[in-house]
């Protein structure tokens, strides 16, 4: 069995007395891709913030076995006064690893844009920068909160394929929040369905397909029907 990188247990998480997460027990294994699928307000993003260490007011624990954790947000959140290279390297001077940044720029398909400012980038290009920035610290786990929701369908598919290539190349574990059933099934080794508040994991759906996957694969269609059934049974759609 692959080595466990993180063990996440959330017994209880509340905001202003309202319980948003309850009874979460999740382990992330080395090299796997896991998606959290559910409706708005079920606590997916809150769970991701707990895993990242950005939210610490909860009852439970997050045990990180090894490696760093990085976060890619829904919006790229690039600093407008910094170049692409500087945004990736978290610095406005030469203190960042220029060789590593140059490699990441090439890997995400932005060769020639190292000195460009964010205002010169399309939405898809800006999100490529955000992904490269997430990889800069050589993380073992990359957390992504609906990273492709703001781009068009064709760009989304290209970014999904890019993410799979990068995860395989750098042997990174991914934990992804999404509302998109097709995206979850195309990317993931496991899809975790979350129910309405208080949010908890109601079903785990393994995806037994090798990558790269054919989006037209009949098995994906059958898995989508199963995922939608699980969402209906959890009273979330």
Swiss-Prot record:
Membrane topology of this protein: Peripheral membrane protein
Gene3D superfamilies from the UniProt entry: P-loop containing nucleotide triphosphate hydrolases
Keywords from the named record: ATP-binding, Cell inner membrane, Cell membrane, Membrane, Nucleotide-binding, Translocase, Transport
SUPFAM superfamilies: P-loop containing nucleoside triphosphate hydrolases (SSF52540)
Keyword Membrane (UniProt): yes
Location(s) in or outside the cell: Cell inner membrane
PROSITE patterns (UniProt xref): ABC_TRANSPORTER_1, ABC_TRANSPORTER_2, SSUB
One Gene Ontology molecular-function label: ATP binding
Coiled-coil ranges (or none): none
EC class (word): translocase
Chemical reaction(s) catalysed: ATP + H2O + aliphatic sulfonate-[sulfonate-binding protein]Side 1 = ADP + phosphate + aliphatic sulfonateSide 2 + [sulfonate-binding protein]Side 1
Domain of life the protein comes from: Bacteria
Residues that coordinate or bind ATP: 38-45
Residues in ABC transporter domain copies: 5-221
InterPro entries: AAA+_ATPase, ABC_transporter-like_ATP-bd, ABC_transporter-like_CS, ABC_transporter_ATP-bind, P-loop_NTPase
Record keyword ATP-binding present: yes
EC numbers: 7.6.2.14
Any matching Pfam family: ABC_tran
GO cellular component: a single term: plasma membrane
Annotated family: Belongs to the ABC transporter superfamily. Aliphatic sulfonates importer (TC 3.A.1.17.2) family.
Role this protein plays: Part of the ABC transporter complex SsuABC involved in aliphatic sulfonates import. Responsible for energy coupling to the transport system.
Subunit description: The complex is composed of two ATP-binding proteins (SsuB), two transmembrane proteins (SsuC) and a solute-binding protein (SsuA).
Name of the molecule in the record: Aliphatic sulfonates import ATP-binding protein SsuB 1
Gene source species: Pseudomonas syringae pv. syringae (strain B728a)
Source taxonomy: Bacteria, Pseudomonadati, Pseudomonadota, Gammaproteobacteria, Pseudomonadales
Gene: ssuB1
């Amino acid at each position: 069995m692959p080595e466990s990188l993180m063990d996440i247990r959330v017994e209880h998480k509340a905001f202003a007395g309202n319980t948003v997460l309850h009874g979460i027990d999740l382990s992330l294994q080395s090299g796997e891709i896991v998606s959290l699928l559910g409706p708005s307000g079920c606590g997916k993003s809150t769970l991701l913030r707990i895993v990242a260490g950005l939210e610490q007011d909860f009852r439970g624990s997050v045990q990180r076995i090894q490696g760093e954790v990085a976060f890619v947000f829904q919006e790229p959140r690039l600093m407008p006064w910094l170049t692409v290279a500087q945004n990736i390297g978290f610095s406005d001077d030469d203190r960042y690893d220029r060789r590593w940044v140059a490699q990441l720029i090439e890997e995400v398909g932005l060769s020639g844009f190292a000195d460009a400012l964010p205002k010169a980038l399309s939405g898809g290009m800006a999100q490529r920068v955000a992904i490269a920035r997430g990889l800069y610290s050589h993380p073992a786990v990359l957390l992504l909160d609906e990273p492709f929701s703001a781009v068009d369908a064709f760009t989304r598919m290209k970014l999904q394929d890019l993410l799979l290539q990068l995860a395989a190349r750098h042997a990174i574990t991914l934990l992804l929040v999404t509302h998109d059933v097709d995206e979850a099934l195309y990317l993931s080794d496991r899809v975790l369905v979350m129910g309405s508040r208080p949010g908890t994991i109601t079903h785990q759906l393994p995806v037994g397909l090798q990558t790269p996957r054919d989006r037209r694969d009949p098995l994906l269609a059958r898995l989508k029907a199963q995922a939608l059934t699980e969402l209906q049974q959890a009273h979330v759609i």
